[in-house]
């Protein structure tokens, strides 16, 4: 979550007249994340999240995102719900941006997740994949193999400013993935961004998943690889096989991976590491100075990518035979 677009109290109060949510008591911007502008609202009834959708989010995709949250919640997944306006619509406009009110989900994200938390994340990810079945709106993954080349071209000329030799390394990685990317794996709705700050816990109990604004249709095991990258590396860059084993066991307790998915994990993990490296690289090079945004280090994901290149078998991630 982040703040790119400022709002005034008067404009916000006018916006809230379109909703049955009580009286505004206070609001503040939320600085975490890099995509939309988000605010925590306290009203006379309930706390709420206000999201203003910035230019990177296509307005045509919003029915998918908001409808998906409704669908998943109806299937028993704990996630925020978009609140309808008095006219029944889920979207309004504020400060020149499409905007929505979202229910507030209790819990906190974990700064230092342990293996037991990774197991719960694996279970929740698999539960989301199962719950997503039957959702009839489709959204291709614009940040998968086909989209990486275009994203790279936006940063390629300045890549060696971040680390010498980066241009040649990433060109080679794109060539490899273009030739070896798995096809015909089970697919469905994926979260595509299930980092620790998008998973809430109350104590050791997972209370819900948030931030579905990268969700799309893709191979389900690709989502697993994203979580391995996001949850199972330590701050020193080392892969924690205990966390990996817990996450994968949790996932397979709900939705067992096929042999083909297991075999593809090293390549999928290279791809998901590259995907987050490329978006972080672009943001690192282009985010305006002074924006209320937390920029993330692209080299963290370059190191993860290099780790996955050395993997000979998915057993090295913690998968039991």
UniProtKB/Swiss-Prot annotation:
GO function terms (MF aspect): ATP binding; homoserine kinase activity
Keywords: Amino-acid biosynthesis, ATP-binding, Kinase, Nucleotide-binding, Threonine biosynthesis, Transferase
Catalytic activity, as annotated: L-homoserine + ATP = O-phospho-L-homoserine + ADP + H(+)
Pathway where it operates: Amino-acid biosynthesis; L-threonine biosynthesis; L-threonine from L-aspartate: step 4/5
Any Pfam family: APH
Enzyme class: transferase
InterPro entries per the UniProt record, alphabetical: Aminoglycoside_PTrfase, Homoserine_kinase_II, Kinase-like_dom_sf, Pseudomonas-type_ThrB
Protein's GO biological process: threonine biosynthetic process
Name the UniProt record assigns to this protein: Homoserine kinase
Homology family: Belongs to the pseudomonas-type ThrB family.
E.C. numbers: 2.7.1.39
Originating gene: thrB
Keyword hit for ATP-binding: yes
CDD domains membership: HomoserineK_II
Key word Nucleotide-binding present: yes
Gene3D superfamilies registered for this protein in UniProt: 3.90.1200.10, Phosphorylase Kinase, domain 1 (3.30.200.20)
